[in-house]
């Protein structure tokens, strides 16, 4: 398998690698990717689901029942549903967000793409995402999958991270640089 040591070195990366291997064997990479995107949205939008994944007070049985019900209501594919059960059984639901990111990286690499983690102060429009992908494609000479995150604390602009490279064009970064320069 063509995984980087960085992904395999982390706990979430090992889970993502295992899920990716199963999805590839079952020719279900696209279905699992879609299910994981639904779960990512649920983590972002639902306080209850986020608490379920992070609370140490939830028992294994309760967590397994809750993720099964959540998977059914979100229309999650069977492989991802079983995987959620494994995470719940092993008390690793707190790793779900990182597993989703790692799986996205593995999936993009499988398609011959590079993944760019993009942080913006406000949600980007489809047109902005398309323009960003086109610009990154010309810079990198390959297709780019974009993993979007919204963080109002950057005030404006973008932070783009591709592998170990980071381009920080945020207003927060510019203001910090200006403050340091003014201190002299």
From Swiss-Prot:
It comes from the Bacteria. InterPro entries: ATP_synth_OSCP/delta_N_sf, ATPase_OSCP/d_CS, ATPase_OSCP/dsu. One of its GO terms (molecular function) is proton-transporting ATP synthase activity, rotational mechanism. The keyword Transmembrane helix does not apply. One of its GO terms (cellular component) is plasma membrane. Disulfide bonds: none annotated. The keyword Transport applies. It holds the Pfam family OSCP. It is found in: Cell inner membrane. Keywords: ATP synthesis, Cell inner membrane, Cell membrane, CF(1), Hydrogen ion transport, Ion transport, Membrane, Transport. PROSITE patterns: ATPASE_DELTA. It is a peripheral membrane protein. PANTHER family: ATP SYNTHASE DELTA CHAIN (PTHR11910). Belongs to the ATPase delta chain family. F(1)F(0) ATP synthase produces ATP from ADP in the presence of a proton or sodium gradient. F-type ATPases consist of two structural domains, F(1) containing the extramembraneous catalytic core and F(0) containing the membrane proton channel, linked together by a central stalk and a peripheral stalk. During catalysis, ATP synthesis in the catalytic domain of F(1) is coupled via a rotary mechanism of the central stalk subunits to proton translocation. F-type ATPases have 2 components, F(1) - the catalytic core - and F(0) - the membrane proton channel. F(1) has five subunits: alpha(3), beta(3), gamma(1), delta(1), epsilon(1). F(0) has three main subunits: a(1), b(2) and c(10-14). The alpha and beta chains form an alternating ring which encloses part of the gamma chain. F(1) is attached to F(0) by a central stalk formed by the gamma and epsilon chains, while a peripheral stalk is formed by the delta and b chains. This is ATP synthase subunit delta.
């Amino acid at each position: 398998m063509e995984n980087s040591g960085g992904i395999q070195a982390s706990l979430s990366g090992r889970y993502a690698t295992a899920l990716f291997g199963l999805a590839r064997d079952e020719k279900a990479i696209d279905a699992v990717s879609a299910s994981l995107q639904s779960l990512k949205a649920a983590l972002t939008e639902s306080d209850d689901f986020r608490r379920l994944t992070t609370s140490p007070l939830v028992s294994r049985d309760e967590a397994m029942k809750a993720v099964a019900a959540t998977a059914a209501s979100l229309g999650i594919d069977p492989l991802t549903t079983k995987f959620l059960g494994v995470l719940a059984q092993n008390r690793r639901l707190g790793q779900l967000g990182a597993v989703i990111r790692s799986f996205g990286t593995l999936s993009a690499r499988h398609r011959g793409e590079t993944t760019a983690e993009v942080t913006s102060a406000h949600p980007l429009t489809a047109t902005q995402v398309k323009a960003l992908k086109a610009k990154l494609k010309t810079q990198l000479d390959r297709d780019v999958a974009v993993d979007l995150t919204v963080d109002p604390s950057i005030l404006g602009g973008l932070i783009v991270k591709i592998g170990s490279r980071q381009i920080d064009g945020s207003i927060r970064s510019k203001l910090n640089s200006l403050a340091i320069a003014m201190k002299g």
